[in-house]
């Protein structure tokens, strides 16, 4: 055939690529002619480890050349293997991270100690491959060659080390607990980062049918932002099941929320297994995401000062000295500008390109990508330093930015959400003179954020103006870093408010928007007359609209369809969302019958330095499988690596 020379040339090129991609035999071929396994240890010159992706490895020194024959930091950082480690948490939706990343680091930057390099243990690799292979299969990605458990990892008898020992570290206190403790036992103590990750992973393993952990990104110093999720089908969005998140430790020195969310995770797991009907109903009808520590780097600084320290600033910022609750895009100023113009939408406001010119923390980026990926309905951010629940807006509409009551269009609903927490909190309702934060008692321990003090760049305002999510801020107490003996009391005071708040996600209405053929309509608008704030449908056409009791006129519309209007009545004591579906009819050739609004959909301005724009932060499992001969969706992450693209990740 005429193409035979071309095929031979292509095969030769692929063979050359394979030789370049895989390290040579070490120390040499055995008598049978096969490649001998790498030695478990060998002499080397140890150098300091300088890889940001591997900054949280359990060792500080490595050596060159590496098992992949990289001979400099530049070669490692330019390699597709290193690029893969940096994006694994996005590709796998946080599954198996940071475990897989640290396993990869043990090959790309081998441990060097006392003039000898050491190989990681094969059993660790095999255990991770068994657990994580389904995650790779789900996105049609081959298992990375450099994580070959036979070639790059050593058996126990040859001497090896556990590359995940950092995750298993600092467990002496947990392991020393007496055996035979009841499954409901919770240790009310402060948790280091390693202990926190371990507790979350243990909890997810214990309740694997309803829980899993994942990472949404990494802090500036490389710590994974670990989330534990609870759902009847963990890892996937279910039709009309609302999504809710709780975030702690956005300020590193405000630690009560961090610990309370660790306790809450254990409580939900234990009570579910014990058959608590309230918890089982909650987990079977709600997808709950708990992020105990948004600022683990700041926590380390605060923890070094010790519990009880109340200096108000030590560890507050992240490692870049950025206040994360002032680091989000200021969409509130844009809202005030748009609100003065009739017929212009004031919801789902895009992020200005100017925002990316400033200093944006990796923790902030991780949160923004997270809430653009999952259709969150409700959220709370847990803080410390006072005893009050505040709600948006946090930025004042006063022309001189002074504190001033600045309500959102959903003022009534936000007050209901805030009261759902405060009204069942014993200390927030305490009328004694010794009560912390007593100046809020006359307000019912709730306040509009801007009426308290005004600031821009807050996370709550961003949630409301950029997405469908309603977020409140909970100040848990006047001591930012309470001593351990106070933690049990804090948990008891906040357990019922947290559960009551989580259940509030089932207030209002929910439903599905479809066309006349039953096909879901994505990004349809759900409008409520008298409330100038729309929500949009998720990819499956489902929506949730938090609403206070009363009568409402609800409208659904989408480009190319006629609008549909319905009147709904929400009873005062109704504790579950009413079902309101819409079937949209396609428009004819006449004038388009839309409600007043912008002439085009608001664009979503993405981080120009972040993930490829075509991915749009959708969950990997939502991607279509590639057509025959085309590349999978995740290939876009590696397009800049030509000619060294990781073709070894392709299955076909």
From Swiss-Prot:
Coiled coil: none annotated. Its cofactor is Zn(2+). Abundantly expressed in the placenta, with low to moderate levels in the brain, lung, thymus and kidney. Residues 594-628 are annotated as: Disordered. InterPro entries: CarboxyPept-like_regulatory, Frizzled_dom, Frizzled_dom_sf, M14_CPZ_CPD, Peptidase_M14, Peptidase_M14_domain. Residues 41-163 form the FZ domain. CDD domains: M14_CPZ, Peptidase_M14NE-CP-C_like. Residues 189-505 form the Peptidase M14 domain. Zn(2+) binds at residues 251, 254, 383. Disulfide bonds join 46-112, 54-105, 96-132, 121-160, 125-149. GO terms for molecular function: metallocarboxypeptidase activity; zinc ion binding. One of its GO terms (cellular component) is extracellular space. Glycans are attached at residues 60, 284. Cleaves substrates with C-terminal arginine residues. Probably modulates the Wnt signaling pathway, by cleaving some undefined protein. May play a role in cleavage during prohormone processing. This is Carboxypeptidase Z. It comes from Rattus norvegicus (Rat). The gene is Cpz.
